Curated annotation (Swiss-Prot):
The gene is atpH. F-type ATPases have 2 components, F(1) - the catalytic core - and F(0) - the membrane proton channel. F(1) has five subunits: alpha(3), beta(3), gamma(1), delta(1), epsilon(1). F(0) has three main subunits: a(1), b(2) and c(10-14). The alpha and beta chains form an alternating ring which encloses part of the gamma chain. F(1) is attached to F(0) by a central stalk formed by the gamma and epsilon chains, while a peripheral stalk is formed by the delta and b chains. It comes from Colwellia psychrerythraea (strain 34H / ATCC BAA-681) (Vibrio psychroerythus). It is found in: Cell inner membrane. This is ATP synthase subunit delta. One of its GO terms (molecular function) is proton-transporting ATP synthase activity, rotational mechanism. PROSITE patterns: ATPASE_DELTA. It is a peripheral membrane protein. Pfam families: OSCP. One of its GO terms (cellular component) is proton-transporting ATP synthase complex. Keywords: ATP synthesis, Cell inner membrane, Cell membrane, CF(1), Hydrogen ion transport, Ion transport, Membrane, Transport. The keyword DNA-binding does not apply.
Length: 177
């Protein structure tokens, strides 16, 4: 099995790098999942193992995949067919999923402040957020004088509003109720 993983690794890496560049990681994951299921089918495995020509294997595989795989995915499968590697698609999928998991460990955090955040503050903030989120943090800093003072931190669904503007808005809401 480790030999198949070794064979699959460069294909998975190439597919993942392309998917990242094209901002289509989820689309590629769906396509590779479908193609891996096709490669696991006993009839397809039998045909590919029977000594079919590269052209026959490529044609059959692309016909079975049909519109489930876009043109870039088809090109990827053609390369795998030419190199007689279609049967390692399940391992390519496993490697792709592992690369995606590593990739997703980074979270993009938007930090808005009334004044520019210093390099020292960025370092301290990054360390604190990495500890809290248990992920590598990429800070995107913005300046918005309307928040008066403090910070507004947004990471995915999480929002920490430590701005004076936010505190005043919460106070106004409390006083109105």
């Amino acid at each position: 099995m480790s030999e198949l993983t070794t064979v699959a690794r460069p294909y998975a890496k190439a597919a993942f790098e392309f998917a990242v560049e094209a901002k289509a990681i989820d689309s590629w994951l769906v396509q590779l999942t479908f193609a891996a299921e096709v490669a696991k089918d006993e009839t397809i495995k039998g045909f590919l193992s029977s000594g079919a020509s590269v052209e026959q294997a490529q044609t059959l595989f692309l016909n079975v995949c049909g519109e489930q795989v876009d043109s870039q995915g088809q090109n990827f499968l053609k390369v795998m067919a030419i190199n007689e590697r279609l049967l390692v698609l399940p391992q390519v999928l496993e490697q792709f999923i592992a690369l995606k998991a590593d990739f997703d460990q980074e979270v993009s955090v938007d930090v808005t402040s009334a004044v520019e955040v210093t390099a020292e503050q960025k370092t301290t903030l990054s360390a604190a957020l990495e500890k809290r989120l248990a992920r590598k943090v990429k800070l995107n800093c913005f300046v918005d004088a309307s928040i008066v003072s403090g910070l507004v931190i947004k990471a995915g669904d999480m929002v920490i509003d430590g701005s004076i503007k936010g505190k005043l808005n919460r106070l106004a809401t409390t006083l109105q109720s």
